[in-house]
Amino acid sequence: MTKLTYKKASIAVAVLLISSSFTNAVHAADEHNVVPGLTAVGKPLGLHGIDPVAFINIGNRISGSASFTETYDNVAYYFSSEDNKNAFKKNPSKYVPQNGGFCTFGVSVGKKFDGNPKFAAVKNGKLYVFLNEDIFKLFQKDQDGTIMKASQQWQKIEHVAALSL
């Protein structure tokens, strides 16, 4: 292989590696509600940086720290302690927000809206987030029905870009 051909091949490999990392971030952004941009670990941030373990275990919205980051399904989550990070690592599906972190009420009607952890509920050990206070109040009127509809709709829209819905 000549120097020029080797250099071109090296550049092509580098471009492929870089573009594949962006593809993962875009993939996560379509299936998970994430904050724009990437974290220090190269993945988008989920749950607005709130510690999901603290949320589920003690019902408290504690901001996590980049010092305690764990990645699951191409999304980075911040934790308030090493213990919480380790608990998540052992069983991430117990702690991640349902419906990819999108607004549960929105998902129940086939849409992907921001899920804001300021408006959230833990029901049957699962975390559900909502767009705003008004939507959260609608959810409170029929929690089981909304969750059931969201679960059915999520199967249809999980892999569909939010802007396409």
Task: Locate each region found by the language model.
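Generic marker of residues within folded, mature protein domains
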Residues: T2-K3, I18, N60, G110
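Charged, low-complexity intrinsically disordered segments
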Residues: V26-Y78, E82-L165
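Bacterial N-terminal signal peptides that target proteins for export
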Residues: T2-A12
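C-terminal segment of classical bacterial N-terminal signal peptides
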Residues: I18-V26
